[in-house]
Amino acid sequence: MAKFSQCFACEHSRIESLAGISEPIQAPTEILRTADSSHGLVADEAASLFAAARDPDRKDEIQLAANQVRARWAPPSVEFIIPVYLTSFCQNECLYCGYRHSNPIAERVHLSLEDFNTQLDLILSWGYRQIELVLSDDPEFGPERVARYVAATRRKLEALGGGEVALCSPVYQQEDYVRLREVGLDWVVEWQETYHRSHFDRWHFAGSAKRDYESRLDLWDRAIAAGITRIGMGVLLGLYDFRYDALAVIEHGNYLRRTYGIEPYALGIPRLKPARGVLASQKPNRFSVSDEDFRLVVSVYHLAFPTSRLFFNTRESYDLNMSLVAAGDLFTVDCETLPGAYLRRHLPGQFSTHDYPPRKEVRATFERRGLAGKYLAEEMPCEIARTTPAAGTAIDEKRWASEHAQLRARLQDWEMALERLSMNGSQPLERQAADASLREILEYLKTVLTTHCREEESELFPAFCEDAEASPKLACFRADHERFGVDLDKLERQMASYGLSKDPTVLLTLGARMIREMRAHLEAEEQLLPSTRRRAVG
């Protein structure tokens, strides 16, 4: 069996060199002139376009050529697709992901087959006929268990006249893909994350199953050998230099052309976005991809693979995606990244997403452009839709008051520990006592506070999601929760740093701010409770 990992080991240095060129090695005008064919681009041609685009005026020229190529070779349609998450438990430590194993604030859910079927009935009633099953690397969700969910999806789609089943999962072996194909899987989605080996290792901690770089590179060879020839490939833009990774994707796609006569079925274009409780994703890094460079990558992909579907998702704003999507692409409108969250809206998931207009409105916009909306049928009545949690859900105020009292008591303990540290931090015994107290408080916050935040999102958010007065506060609460997760990560790092430096300055400043913000959050939360609002009115 062919292996791309062996091929890429020989091509890596060439791709690295191509990514760094500052001047085109081929005339961009000639590349764009000959690009009006179904043959696409090779890495050298794409590298010349990236180099030419260092001149901003060239970017519009490249995008115009890409749109013309798509209009000629791709079908006049856009395919709708909806992700359905099965589990948020994960054994991996990917520094950018909200579901990384050590993230204390991540909501962990296994979606039972019964709940999956209930949610799928709701999704199908909305008209969706292309379903992407998504799961993290959960040892309890092996390929045989996933096969049951694939089979259930296939049965329901066939009962409605057919549709497509895609899967984004951990990498599997050839026999696993055979089994999944037999029960109804149509195509597989998998992102390499980054093709750069050393940066791949930096983003994925040792001990993670995902750290097996070669196995990930070769998964398409295994899937194709298993009879799955429709594949979605790509990278997570922002983990390394976007030119290198985009060129590596193009090299991989051309390998599939040469070796198997297969075009990539879809190309992923996700950008690194903030994830709850994940410090590495919260701020730009030197590889962050600007909107203009994102547009460039999309245009070059459109030229490189004129018939492949670019996978537009809700990580990006609606306006940005609508300015880039072209004939033949994939488009996501509804996106919940927590298992079961379509039944209970407004719950946090794997990463930050944008709200989009209603699916009917989006389809109508495409139709006005001359693009038919595929895999989105007319909506049907569904009893499940009326049982989705709504505003006005009863709230157990006594339980909330008790939890708030406990949290306030621990915040006071924390404040006292910081005060002792500021006064006596230079004395070894006092330092040891303060350190032990702070570590106990940190562990408490990582469990109790994060649980409280999750309960707030699962109970208060549905209860007040349609309340015009409360909605702005809910948006602030979600931002608070994300900041708390990041701050807990920072606090843990600062405690380790203090143990080495013996300088408590940063620890004291960070702790004081966190205490102040948590108290303000609890007070704002209490202002939402019905009894408080009644007293305010009275």
Write out the residue ranges for each language-model feature.
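Auxiliary Fe-S-binding modules of radical SAM enzymes
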Residues: M1-R54, L124, R258-A391
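Conserved, mostly hydrophobic/aromatic
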Residues: S38, A66, C94, E190, ...
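N-terminal pre-triad scaffold of radical SAM enzymes
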Residues: I62-N103, R108-V134, D186
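Active-site beta-loop-alpha junctions enriched in small/polar residues
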Residues: Y85, S136-D138, C168-Y172, E193-Y195, ...
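Core AdoMet radical
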Residues: H101-D115, I123-A223, R230-G232, G261-G268
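Catalytic cores of alpha/beta
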Residues: Q173-E182, Y240-N254, S317-A327
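Small-residue-biased structural context
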Residues: P389-G538
